[in-house]
């Protein structure tokens, strides 16, 4: 087990230490999982995370706020044990982030399902031409009576092809740049919705290109107000950017654990590698970088939890480091 002394930092409260202990026990009993069939593995992980009550932290009830420190602790711990487990948790939070922060009572029924692990979610923002440049989204949402008709494409969408519900960002008004964008909650079985292509990466996880062809959704599918899409997307990303750093921190802690184990067990000239001053220096540098990263990550999370409206600077620093 990695060093847990960082939990005594002033960023954390007793509930975070209790959460960390529960997570360690759950991970030891359930991870890693078989990655042979990635789709099946992700679905099984989401169901297991839901049964364990871990997905409760992926979204907030109406009137409550997300505990970003808890999100970071969960992502760090899961990533240290199994990267796919971290992915599965993170996508439930990111996918339903807009609903958690801005959704109507009707839309929040989906949040209950995703937090229970009974439905998978996805965040459909990135496009083939504009990438993640939200201001240049081209997918359109044309008002037609009581409905909106969506046309366009999204790509590199995590959980694409296996998600039950998607948050889709589209241009609903004739306005330039960030203005005129809206967010829609779209079930995967909506007519006109197509998984155009499944995408492969070096580290396998579900990714897809989506295509919308005259896809009709009711006005009640819109999340928040018309034209609020940019603000909604930035609010969601603002929360989850610091958690990206937390996942990387989990990978780094695992690397340090493995390094120390190897240096302790591997002998050269009749002595462990760990006795060599040069090796000790490298391990010390790793530990220093990990603590520096953790301080940046949990500073950002603590700042958000204490009421900051935006943590773009702090989260960007944490993610960069």
Regions inferred by a protein language model and the residue ranges of each:
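Glycine-rich phosphate/pyrophosphate-binding beta-alpha loops
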Residues: 80, 155-161, 201-202, 239-243
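N-terminal glycine-rich flavin-associated loop
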Residues: 83-105, 131-134
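A short core secondary-structure module
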Residues: 151-194
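A short, charged helix-loop
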Residues: 208-235
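Short Ser/Thr-interspersed hydrophobic loop/turn segments at strand-loop and sheet-helix junctions
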Residues: 75-79, 170, 186-190, 213-217
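Alpha-helical interface subdomain recognition
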Residues: 1-80, 102, 117, 143-148, ...
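A gly/ser-rich beta-alpha-beta helix-loop segment of oxidoreductase catalytic cores
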Residues: 120-143
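Flexible, small-/acidic-enriched active-site or ligand-binding loops
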Residues: 136, 189-218
């Amino acid at each position: 087990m990695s060093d847990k002394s960082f939990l005594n930092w002033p960023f954390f409260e007793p509930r975070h230490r209790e959460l960390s202990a529960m997570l360690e026990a759950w991970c030891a009993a359930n991870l890693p999982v078989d990655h042979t069939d990635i789709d099946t593995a992700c679905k099984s992980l989401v169901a297991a995370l839901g049964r364990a009550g871990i997905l409760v932290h992926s979204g907030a009830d109406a009137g409550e706020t997300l505990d970003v420190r808890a999100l970071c602790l969960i992502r760090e711990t899961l990533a240290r044990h199994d990267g796919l487990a971290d992915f599965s948790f993170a996508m439930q939070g990111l996918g339903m982030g807009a609903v958690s922060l801005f959704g109507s009572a009707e839309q929040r029924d989906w949040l209950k399902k995703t937090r229970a692990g009974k439905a998978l979610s996805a965040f459909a923002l990135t496009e083939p031409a504009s990438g993640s440049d939200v201001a240049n989204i081209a997918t359109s949402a044309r008002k037609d009576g009581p409905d909106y008709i969506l046309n366009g494409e999204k790509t590199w969408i995590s959980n694409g092809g296996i998600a039950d519900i998607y948050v889709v960002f589209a241009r609903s008004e004739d306005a330039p740049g960030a203005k005129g964008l809206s967010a829609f909650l779209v079930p995967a079985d909506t007519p006109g919705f197509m998984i155009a292509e499944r995408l492969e990466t070096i580290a396998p996880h579900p990714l897809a290109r989506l295509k919308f062809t005259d896809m009709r959704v009711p006005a009640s599918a819109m999340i928040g107000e018309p034209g609020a899409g940019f603000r909604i997307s930035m609010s969601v990303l603002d929360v989850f950017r610091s958690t990206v750093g937390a996942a990387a921190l989990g990978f780094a802690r695992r690397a340090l654990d493995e390094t120390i184990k190897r240096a302790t067990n591997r002998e050269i000239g009749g002595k462990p590698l760990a006795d060599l001053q040069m090796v000790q220096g490298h391990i010390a540098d790793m530990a220093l970088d990990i603590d520096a990263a953790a301080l940046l990550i949990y500073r950002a999370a603590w700042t958000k939890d204490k009421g900051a409206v935006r943590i773009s600077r702090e989260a960007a620093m944490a993610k960069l480091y």
